[in-house]
A protein has these predicted regions:
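N-terminal start-of-chain detector that recognizes signal peptides
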Residues: 4-9, 44-50, 88
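Active-site scaffold of zinc-dependent metalloenzymes
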Residues: 52-97, 107-126
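Generic detector of short, locally flexible boundary/turn motifs and exposed helical patches
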Residues: 1-3, 36-45, 80-81, 119, ...
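N-terminal small/polar-rich segments of proteins
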Residues: 1-21, 28
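Short alpha-helical functional segments enriched in proximate histidine and acidic residues
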Residues: 20, 24, 99, 103-107
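Amphipathic, non-transmembrane alpha-helical scaffold segments
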Residues: 7, 11, 93-97, 101
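Auxiliary, metal-adjacent structural segments of Zn-dependent hydrolase domains
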Residues: 18-75
């Protein structure tokens, strides 16, 4: 699958998803830059990554009052997501949403356990 198509599907999914989030979470989501990338390797610290990541949150979390001017960013690695989902469009779209919500949870200051407790690893928001 080509990156342009995967980007288009991801963009559609993310726009739909943000619209149905609770208002406070929706407002938080709008403060985060979303970067759709083919795969890890384009970031300055990517040499520390395994290469099979689906997404990554970088920058200050919403709880940090002073982020030193750094912009919070969620990076989604579309080729990894595509391969992870068995190259099925429906599953890919679902996983884009799930991965975004998971990384958004980190922006909100939640650790892995708190993200899981809210169901964000399964695409649900509690």
């Amino acid at each position: 699958m080509d990156f342009e198509t995967l980007s288009s599907w991801a963009d559609e999914e993310l726009k739909s998803l943000v619209k149905i989030l609770p208002a406070d979470v929706q407002a938080a989501a709008k403060k985060v830059v979303i970067s759709l990338e083919e795969q890890p390797g384009q970031g300055s610290d990517d040499d520390t990554l395994e290469g099979d990541e689906l997404g990554l949150f970088e920058g200050p979390c919403a709880l940090d009052e002073d982020g030193d001017g750094e912009v919070p960013r969620i990076r989604l690695f579309l080729m990894n997501l595509w391969e992870w989902t068995g190259e099925e469009e429906h599953d890919y779209r679902d996983e884009v949403g799930t991965t975004f919500l998971h990384e958004l949870g980190h922006y909100l200051g939640w650790d892995e356990d708190e993200v899981a407790d809210r169901g964000l690893e399964h695409g649900f928001f509690i």
